[in-house]
């Protein structure tokens, strides 16, 4: 007779599942509350003590941690030595393990939870049985999710529990135990902090630090101000990423994950002034990052406006004295070294995506002029600035830039012409030195026409459209210089 071990905290569906197992001639073994629930419903069940010949002890902390349990789960039924060991030690094989775990996450979600409450809800025997049975999935069926009960029964009835399905159950187990262990780490670790709320007040949120190096947001040295909010953290990370792209003194202002003003200069105060002038309206309440020490002159400029967060590699004593006069502003020191092997993760329904960060640096030498007109030296400098910025703007993205600053940004539009029109509408200046940078190619020549109508004389774009020549021909017709990078910078 096949044997099943049932030990569940979530008893959803366990009674009808157990009844159907007995109909399929499974002998049931169970522990504690699960055994009582089965007995209360007149289902024949034996205690695991009959397998272990050892009672539950220590308030149930030790009941399944026994060689007779794990030998019965882990034995390779095709290995004669394993079968012999089972016979020698009186170990009975277990064919089905049904386990779900103490509700640790639900317990610690209670704001009044104590550390002892959390500790008592750390399951030990459950994860151990799950991992043992999942490892031996070719011989043992492992069920961690009540949603799988019906399908398991049907496959048992039709003898279609093939290796593919068993492996699916195995993967679900290790995903579950991984998440369970992560929840424990997150609760007890100093690397996890509960935020006031998430993107909106009705959303709960936490900040989990996985890498607290001094050049990361997680490793920031907080000099002043209240804790960062969820939105502060996201915006600060976007700001930090962009400002690190620049070698010369640079300042970046971000609102809602998009740069609103980027400036460079001979000194950092000039860079900030250029970033401010790029969009003096949108910078209000924004996040600013600078890649040089904040000095007195720069601090005085920033003190005059409302900013949520200022990030820099260092603040002078005079700058700190000026800026800390504002109680609510956050001041963070972060090193400006760029990690060369960073990955980024994006959660999606049922999983997550992983990709390398967009760190590719395209220089003038990598670009090619595709029109009769060549860019001027001032336009080349604007190309380099605009191309650095456009990869940090949500697609479809258009950035207008001169050799010192962005002058107009069109972000997150469903079509490229729309992004160009917004950038042009918001432009603080328009002259022969202003360059239009596009994160993606032009599928037709309408963006060139829009640029020409606004007086733009130079365009940089990736190229790669089957209609590239249409855009090139239109640029030649209008006397516009066009440069292609052969690199796309979509940002979703």
UniProtKB/Swiss-Prot annotation:
Record pathway: Purine metabolism; IMP biosynthesis via de novo pathway; 5-formamido-1-(5-phospho-D-ribosyl)imidazole-4-carboxamide from 5-amino-1-(5-phospho-D-ribosyl)imidazole-4-carboxamide (10-formyl THF route): step 1/1; Purine metabolism; IMP biosynthesis via de novo pathway; IMP from 5-formamido-1-(5-phospho-D-ribosyl)imidazole-4-carboxamide: step 1/1
Keyword Hydrolase appears in the UniProt entry: yes
Boundaries of every MGS-like domain copy: 1-144
UniProt key word Glycoprotein: no
The entry's keywords: Hydrolase, Multifunctional enzyme, Purine biosynthesis, Transferase
CDD domains: IMPCH
Signal peptide (residue range): none
InterPro entries documented for this protein: AICAR_Tfase_dup_dom_sf (IPR024051), Cytidine_deaminase-like (IPR016193), MGS-like_dom (IPR011607), MGS-like_dom_sf (IPR036914), PurH-like (IPR002695)
EC number assigned by the record: 2.1.2.3, 3.5.4.10
Record family assignment: Belongs to the PurH family.
Record-given protein name: Bifunctional purine biosynthesis protein PurH
